[in-house]
Amino acid sequence: LSNETPAEKKALKTLKLGKTYSLVGEPENYILLDYIRYSTDGINYAKPLHHMALFNRLLKERYEGKLYLKYEFDVDALPEVCNLLAEDTNTISVTVNGETVERNGSSPLEKALWKYDVASKLKVGRNEIVILINYFQSETVYYALFGENVTETLKNCLAYDTDIEACALKGSFGVYGDFAKGKEENIVIGENFRIGKQKQTITRLIEEGYPFFSGDITLKQTVIVEDTN
């Protein structure tokens, strides 16, 4: 064993980072469209409903037939890249601001999501996407939901013939809205989301353009080090 006294370790110094970061590149962003105005004739539309609330209404009414699903959103600045990501729920057609768009493969995020290039169809202001579907459910679905003496096994194996889903837009844009602090720490509540130009400097990621972001994003900042010892 050595009798040498171990060298005293120097206390580590804390390097404080600033609050503002610069955005590197143009990461593809997302906005979720989960409220729907629906119509059975393509002319008269109901007030906006959350997609799950609409689904429950249709199940209770046992509706069957063509169904127009209108997703509305606002655009402050037109993005160069914008794709609609939507599931095939017995889809007949998809229009953006009255113009038909065609499928352009599936999303790398999830193969069940079809991709539609909609950038050239957007306009500044209120935009609308209308997805026309053939809505129906089999009697097996209604029996499992509302029948008597239904086993848990049948309920657990239930598969709907037609779903009512939210859709999303993915592209080179920022997403902005009205934000407020939630009841718990680090919880933020947002509403009235809209598409705008991506900010180049960011202090708070969620409130400054990325409330729905999923994926990798690179931020940078300059740090001044006065003492390197």
Which residue stretches match the model-derived regions?
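Aromatic-lined ligand-binding clefts that engage carbohydrates, nucleic acids, or primary amines
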Residues: 73-98, 129, 223-225, 229
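Solvent-exposed beta-strand/loop surfaces of large extracellular or lumenal domains
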Residues: 89, 94-116
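Extracellular structured ligand-interaction cores
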Residues: 68-70, 81, 89-91, 113, ...
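Generic beta-strand/beta-sheet core signal
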Residues: 85-87, 97, 104, 132-134, ...
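A glycine-anchored, Pro-Gly-centered beta-turn/N-cap motif
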Residues: 80, 118, 123-125
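Short acidic, gly/pro-rich beta-turn/loop elements at beta-sheet edges
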Residues: 81, 94, 104, 139-141, ...
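Short beta-strands within extracellular/lumenal beta-sheet-rich domains
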Residues: 61-75, 112-116, 213-227
